[in-house]
């Protein structure tokens, strides 16, 4: 697919209409089969997905209750009439609706979850980076670099190899997301 990529602080989470969608479990599960990586299946990643969110409808087996990114389901005036017509027409056509796009069944007409708190976008830069930059020991942020490999010691990621123009170097953290993240996982 040709996807717009968020080449800004916060990555694609800063440009994606505030949609909060983890991706289908089979996408994550295929990484192990295709690239031989361990620990990247949907079930193994689910605790991390839950840790990053505070879900407006409450914590559950699939949702967190005290993470930095607030996730909601559009209600009231936030339900655009065109989106409502799309969901309703899918149900009328016989498709089984799902109540939770990030729950046990991700298929069927439903409302997207949104990374929204009040009326403020909940991007990774707002929820993770800004607080870290305001802290006592702020990280160094490198822009316009491309991660090429994650470095592990004893099962823990301890660094990232990256390219910045013609310079290749090593860093300490990666924020590779679901859109294009598999290229870093397999490197």
Question: PLM features: residue spans?
Answer:
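A general structural signal for short secondary-structure junctions and capping/turn motifs
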Residues: 5-7, 61, 89, 131, ...
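Active-site-proximal beta-strand/loop segments in catalytic clefts of secreted hydrolases
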Residues: 6, 17-18, 100-102, 143-146, ...
């Amino acid at each position: 697919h040709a996807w717009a990529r968020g080449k800004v602080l916060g990555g694609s989470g800063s440009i994606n209409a505030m949609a909060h969608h983890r991706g289908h479990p089979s996408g994550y599960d295929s990484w192990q089969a295709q690239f031989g990586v361990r620990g990247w299946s949907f079930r193994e990643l689910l605790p991390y997905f839950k840790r990053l969110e505070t879900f407006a409808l409450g914590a559950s087996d699939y949702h967190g209750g005290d993470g930095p990114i607030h996730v909601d389901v559009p209600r009231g005036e936030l339900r655009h009439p065109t989106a409502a017509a799309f969901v309703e027409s899918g149900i009328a056509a016989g498709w089984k609706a799902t109540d939770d796009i990030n729950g046990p069944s991700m298929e069927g007409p439903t409302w997207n979850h949104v990374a929204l708190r009040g009326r403020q976008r909940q991007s990774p830069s707002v929820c993770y980076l800004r607080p870290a930059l305001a802290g006592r020991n702020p990280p160094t942020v490198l822009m316009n670099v491309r991660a090429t490999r994650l470095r592990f010691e004893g099962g823990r990621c301890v660094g990232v190899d990256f390219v910045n123009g013609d310079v290749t170097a090593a860093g300490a953290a990666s924020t590779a997301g679901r859109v294009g993240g598999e290229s870093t996982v397999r490197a």
